Amino acid sequence: RISIIAAGPIFNFLLAFVLAVIVIGFAGSDKPYVQGVIDKYPAQEAGLEKGDLITSVNGSRVHLFREIQIYMAMNPGKSLDVTYVRDNQTHETTLVPKYDEANNTYYMGIYSGARYGLKWYETLQYSLYEVKYNVVTVIKSLGMIFTGDLPMTSFSGPVGIATTVNDMVEEVNTSMADESFSDRAMTMFLTLANFVVMISANLGVMNLLPIPALDGGRLLFLLIEAVRGKPVPKEKEAIVHIAGI
C-alpha cells in the first residue's frame, strides 16, 4: 500500500527528469559561467572576470546559474564566499552584494544565465541538477512561508498557473513573430516543457508532505500502522482527512 501511494510522487519526479532531459538536450543548461561583470560592483572589486566558472557559494556547491540567484534572493545582503575556476585553477574570494534601491534588491554585479550545450552524459547529469534545483527551491520556499519571510500569495493555484502558461505563450509569439512556425513551435514546446518540469517537481514534494487528504498524509497513517502493528481506526483517519480538505 505504501508503494502504491508513493508511486504518484515518484512519477512526478520521473516526469520532471524526463522532460528536463528533453529540454536540456535541445537547449542546454545555464552553467554558472560569468558572462560579464558590471563596473564598480562587488564582483568586479572581488576580482571576478568574464569566463570564470562559479563552483560554490558559502560552501554550497552550485551547478546552475539560477542557484546563485535563488541563494541571493533567499539571503539578501549576506556576505558571499565564492569559489570559482579560471584557467583550470581554483580561486576563492569574498564579496558583499550591493543594494539597488530602485529595484529593492541586491546584486553581485555579474550577468549570465546563457544556456550551454552539453554532451549526452552531461545532459543526464544536469537534468538531475534541474530536478534537484526545483525540489530544493520549493522546500526552502515552504520554510520561508512558515517563518513569515515569504507570503502565501507567492504560491499559485490552478488559475495562477493557467495565467502563467498563457503569458509564456504570448511572450513566445510576440518575441518570435518574425520566425518560422516550426521555430516558434519548438521554442513554445521547450518553454512549456521546462515549466512542467518545475510543476512536476513541486507536486512531487507537496504530495509527500504529511498533509491530510494528500498522498503524504496517507503515507503518514500507513507508517503509523507499520510502527504500531495495527491501523488507525478508519473513522479517525477519515476525520483527519476531511479536516485537511
Question: What are these language model-derived features?
Answer:
Residues 99-203, 220-242:
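Functional transmembrane alpha-helices
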Residues 30, 154-157, 209-222:
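Juxtamembrane/interfacial segments flanking transmembrane helices
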Residues 27-44, 49:
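Alpha-helical transmembrane signal-anchor/signal-peptide segments
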